[in-house]
């Protein structure tokens, strides 16, 4: 098979096109108009802002001062944005075209210019410094921070639903998702133009693949925002359980009051232009996970709640819900390409995945065993809701579960906001801070409506894990890998991918059906 067919019509640049990303400040003024016109090319694929916004969400690259000619009030955020585009040198004119779509992928400088237009920076404010990559320990911390999130709280509940043997499924999911993360790496290595998960989708299936994957990733972030509201509401209701309010004949109970209160608290953080502080705070997610696990163990061992034997070995009727929750626990593939792209030594990415997934599955299993052993069949959707409030460790855990979503909500919503602005307001003249505030406010209020309608943390997590995580973390990595590297794979590699795809389809269908059934039953 010819090279062109194997690489899905990759367009190689001519000598005249070979212009490196690292451009000096003197040359930039002369070229800014051409770069600006390229970045605003109508044929550029949506979403163009995905990589930048997700990198801001995860903080995968340590920030450096790479923007100049700007007052210090803007330095922190702009420097963070500039640091997102430090990767191996590539040609500014390189473009990728699949057999089904000839729309080019954006270069790194196009990405920077596009995002600078979103946050109100001019071309003359930009300068491109030396590459600033993540070290191996930083990459490991980023990986753990992405994977080990709010799903940690619901692992004991998943064991209650599926039984002790459900932990075998948790372990198998960790192995599978770690492997599919490596498949994404191999897809990225097939072309220097591929940077993000949507890029991989376009390489495999044209613009349709890019669009489907982008929508799924944005849906994941949206559901996370809903989960944050529910999480804050549930834990605040645990602290203040007897609060009620009657407004114009409408009676609100404690969870509803605190869902509204939590929304009002996070709303100003969404309006912020500078998200750097929130990004730094959310980067401590790994330490939060350790703190929550320690608090749970402390309450069980020191405060006297104790650990008890017993429980179901296997509950086939409720196992699909547990499958969805376990899938929810490993839904981090949306940003794994960004972690890979930011590494000083990309060859160590498989080791980063191995350590990150190993850490997460270890903590998931420990928390699941401790929580279910302590509270048994009485375990609730979040183990913090079962912890006796008279103990200091319980109070620390509950308030940690309240504060953490406040730092993460705006970061999770930002990629959705930028994607919608890009889609709904294609012209820069139509964009303004006021319009952005309006879109953000509507999105925040919509998450409140969903949280009030479906205030079931574990079931929403199970639905997300069954439907979205199975597609994003199981099925699409294998499909993209088979498509991009078609003709160069062994029968064993193909067989493994087919097995994972079938497993994802079966798990996704069973889990989604069960989760929807639970939601309907709760609403009746």
Swiss-Prot record:
**Transmembrane spans:** 139-159, 164-184, 211-231, 247-267, 280-300, 319-339, 349-369, 398-418, 442-462, 465-485, 496-516
Annotated membrane topology: Multi-pass membrane protein
Q: A single GO BP annotation from the record?
A: amino acid transport
Composition bias type Low complexity, residue spans: 33-43
Do you know which Pfam families this protein is assigned to? Aa_trans (PF01490)
User: Can the keyword Transmembrane be found in this entry's annotation?
Assistant: yes
- What's the main place this protein lives? membrane
Key words, A-Z: Amino-acid transport, Membrane, Transmembrane, Transmembrane helix, Transport
Annotated region Disordered: where? Answer: 1-47
Q: Name one GO cellular component term.
A: organelle membrane
Q: Which InterPro entries match?
A: AA_transpt_TM (IPR013057)
Which regions are flagged for Acidic residues bias?
Answer: 14-32
What intrachain disulfides are recorded? Answer: none
Subcellular location(s) of the protein: Membrane
Q: Which family does it belong to?
A: Belongs to the amino acid/polyamine transporter 2 family. Amino acid/auxin permease (AAAP) (TC 2.A.18.5) subfamily.
Under the heading PANTHER family, the entry gives:
AMINO ACID TRANSPORTER, TRANSMEMBRANE AMINO ACID TRANSPORTER FAMILY PROTEIN
Q: Write down what this protein is called.
A: Amino acid transporter AVT1G
Q: Which organism is it from?
A: Arabidopsis thaliana (Mouse-ear cress)
* Taxon lineage: Eukaryota, Viridiplantae, Streptophyta, Embryophyta, Tracheophyta
């Amino acid at each position: 098979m010819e090279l062109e067919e194997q690489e899905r019509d990759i367009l190689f640049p001519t000598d005249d096109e070979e212009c490196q990303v690292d451009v000096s400040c003197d040359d930039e003024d002369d070229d800014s108009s051409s770069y600006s016109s390229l970045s605003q090319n109508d044929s550029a694929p949506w979403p163009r802002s995905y990589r930048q916004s997700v990198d801001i969400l995860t903080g995968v690259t340590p920030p450096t001062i790479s923007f100049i000619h700007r007052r210090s009030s803007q330095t922190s955020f702009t420097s963070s944005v500039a640091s997102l585009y430090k990767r191996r040198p590539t040609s500014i004119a390189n473009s990728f075209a699949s057999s089904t779509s000839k729309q080019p992928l954006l270069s790194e400088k196009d990405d920077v210019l596009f995002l600078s237009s979103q946050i109100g920076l001019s071309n003359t404010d930009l300068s491109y410094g030396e590459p600033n990559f993540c070290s191996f320990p930083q990459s490991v911390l980023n990986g753990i921070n992405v994977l080990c999130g709010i799903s940690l709280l619901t692992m004991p509940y998943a064991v209650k639903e599926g039984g002790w043997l459900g932990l075998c499924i948790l372990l198998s999911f960790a192995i599978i998702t770690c492997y599919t993360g490596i498949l994404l790496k191999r897809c990225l290595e097939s072309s220097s133009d591929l940077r993000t998960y949507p890029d991989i989708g376009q390489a495999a299936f044209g613009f349709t693949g890019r669009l489907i994957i982008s929508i799924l990733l944005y849906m994941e972030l949206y559901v996370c925002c809903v989960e944050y509201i529910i999480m804050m509401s549930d834990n605040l209701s645990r602290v203040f359980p007897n609060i009620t309010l009657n407004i114009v004949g409408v009676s609100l109970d404690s969870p509803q009051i605190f869902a509204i209160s939590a929304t009002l608290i996070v709303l100003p953080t969404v309006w912020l232009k500078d998200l750097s502080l929130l990004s730094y705070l959310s980067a401590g997610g790994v330490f939060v996970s350790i703190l929550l696990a320690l608090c749970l163990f402390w309450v069980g061992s020191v405060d006297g709640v104790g650990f008890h034997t017993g429980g179901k070995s296997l509950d086939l009727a409720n196992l699909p819900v547990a499958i969805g929750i376990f899938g929810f626990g490993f839904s981090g593939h949306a940003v794994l390409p960004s972690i890979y792209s930011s590494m000083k030594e990309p060859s160590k990415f498989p080791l980063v995945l191995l350590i990150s997934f190993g850490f997460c599955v270890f903590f998931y299993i420990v928390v699941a065993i401790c929580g279910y052993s302590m509270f048994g069949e009485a375990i609730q959707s979040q183990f913090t809701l079962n912890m006796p409030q008279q103990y200091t460790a319980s109070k620390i855990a509950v308030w940690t579960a309240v504060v953490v979503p406040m730092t993460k909500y705006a970061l999770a919503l930002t990629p959705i906001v930028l994607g919608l602005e890009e889609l709904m307001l294609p012209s820069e003249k139509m964009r303004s801070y006021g319009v952005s505030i309006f879109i953000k406010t509507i999105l925040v209020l919509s998450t409140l409506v969903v949280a009030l309608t479906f205030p079931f943390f574990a079931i929403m997590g199970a639905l997300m894990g069954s439907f979205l995580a199975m597609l994003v973390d199981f099925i699409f990595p294998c499909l993209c890998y088979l498509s991009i590297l078609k003709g160069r794979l062994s029968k064993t590699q193909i067989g493994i991918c087919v097995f994972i795809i079938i497993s994802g389809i079966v798990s996704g269908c069973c889990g989604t059906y069960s989760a929807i059934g639970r939601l309907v039953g709760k609403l009746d």
